[in-house]
Amino acid sequence: MKHILHIICLAFCLTAMAAYGTEGKKPSATARQMERAGYVIIQKADPTIHVSLMYARADNFTGRVLYTDLREAYLHPKAAAALVKAQKRLKQLRPDLSLKVYDAARPMHIQQTMWNVVRGTKKDIYVSNPAHGGGMHNYGLAVDITLCNAKGDTLDMGTKIDYLGTAAHINQEDVLVRQHRISKQA
């Protein structure tokens, strides 16, 4: 009888843990730093926005995982409100599409790691130097986004996310279309 009671208790605990998912987990050191700075979690501001942090994976321009303990995307409250507004507008125009966040607020020590990768190369124009205060990502005021379908599959934007080259320059769009380096649809 004791064994059955233990099994029932264990099953209850496992079910409760599965039901709560990661909500019961203690925030990481980086997450606590973001929260102390007053940043908000994008997924809580609007759960319909997809998030796939590119620096939590190795398939980025550095070739390594930079966000070792960060899984949530954070933004300054005003930037988060603007992103939520953009998502609502997108849903009005195209209910089948959604915004997908690849990067948002970024700790300065991560910025330093990125800078170390590009320092002294032709690509250093794409990464803010932390010695000069970093960039808008470091203050929760920049967000790297794309569009995705309901399954989270991204739409073709002409270049891969995190592409460090002229095809990604927004001020060169017309020239790049004429040169067939990007499409008009992108």
Give the role of each language-model region:
Residues M1-K25:
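Bacterial Sec-dependent N-terminal signal peptides
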Residues Y20-A104, M114-V117, T121-A186:
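Extracytoplasmic cell-surface/polysaccharide-interacting catalytic and binding patches
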Residues P107:
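Segments that shape or occlude catalytic/ligand-binding pockets
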Residues I110:
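Short, well-ordered surface patches within globular domains
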